Amino acid sequence: MKPLSRRQEQVLQATVHHYVDTMEPVGSRTLVQRFSMPASSATIRSAMGALEQRGLLTQPHTSSGRIPSALGYRHYVDCLLPEPAATVLHLERELTGLSLGWAALDDLLLQLARRLTDFTGLMSLITRPTRTQPQLAAIRLVQSGERLLVMLVENSGHASHLNLRLPHATSDELDAIERWAEQQLRGGALNWEKLPTQLQRSGDVLRHALEHPSISAEPTTLVHGLSRLVAEPEFQSAQDLGPLLQLIDDEPMALISPGAEARVLIGQEHPQSALEACSVVQAPYRCGQEGTGHIALIGPMRMAYATACSAVERVARHLELLLS
């Protein structure tokens, strides 16, 4: 495809900014006046026509102005994204006041999601790091009749518990398993092949519970700002909103597109058809041995991409610092 001329790029950028601000189609006269373009209205109108022919602008109604198409937004994000506004510095100052307390990772992620939504006006989503198996720092076993409470403390400080039925275990067995686990974890992980034979009957039950998918498979997904999304004019019909709400409710992880790099997915670029009227701005964050989580902003294609991209990247890097 032939590259855009400098004037065509200026017109596309101005059209995107106008539509994001006003949600109104724009004509050449308004662009000249609002953005002080050094060209006549006829020249700008010609550039808009060329952009429409290339699929970067579209004319929603007869005799109306133009608005960006999904392809136009893509070119804008890839080639014309301006530097983020100075207001992003305000977000950075807010982030410096956050810290990770003992067993408070989910609380921290929720605070970050709230700040992202408040700053951008978009729905935010943050996942806890994915892991194939939790990195344990300690295991505590508490017996109550035929039930066993297993308390797990991970290296990240996150705490969880399991409630198992273990009628045949004795207190001496459980004490021995706890001591064995403590010694094993000093070396980094539990090696069940080294569990003493006399402890294997009770140990096998515990091993099965620790390897159950409820602990290790699907990361926690925190969503904030759904009310902001449904308030957008683009999502006022049940036909547009219904599939999106169902996806958020049933499978929020599907909002994130797999990948190890920051990405902006616009409209039908996203594999989920429920998001074809949306854009998703996402970035990964890494948490040492804990794995990788994701931060994302979801909104209409008509979004302030420079602010959204900058905010997601800054929160991801700040979270990595807190978790390092």
From Swiss-Prot:
InterPro entries: GAF-like_dom_sf (IPR029016), HrcA (IPR002571), HrcA_C (IPR021153), WH-like_DNA-bd_sf (IPR036388), WH_DNA-bd_sf (IPR036390), WHTH_transcript_rep_HrcA_IDD (IPR023120). Coiled coil: none annotated. It comes from the Bacteria. The gene is hrcA. It comes from Synechococcus sp. (strain CC9902). Belongs to the HrcA family. Keywords: Repressor, Stress response, Transcription, Transcription regulation. This is Heat-inducible transcription repressor HrcA. Negative regulator of class I heat shock genes (grpE-dnaK-dnaJ and groELS operons). Prevents heat-shock induction of these operons. GO terms for biological process: negative regulation of DNA-templated transcription. The keyword Signal does not apply. The keyword Transcription regulation applies. GO terms for molecular function: DNA binding.
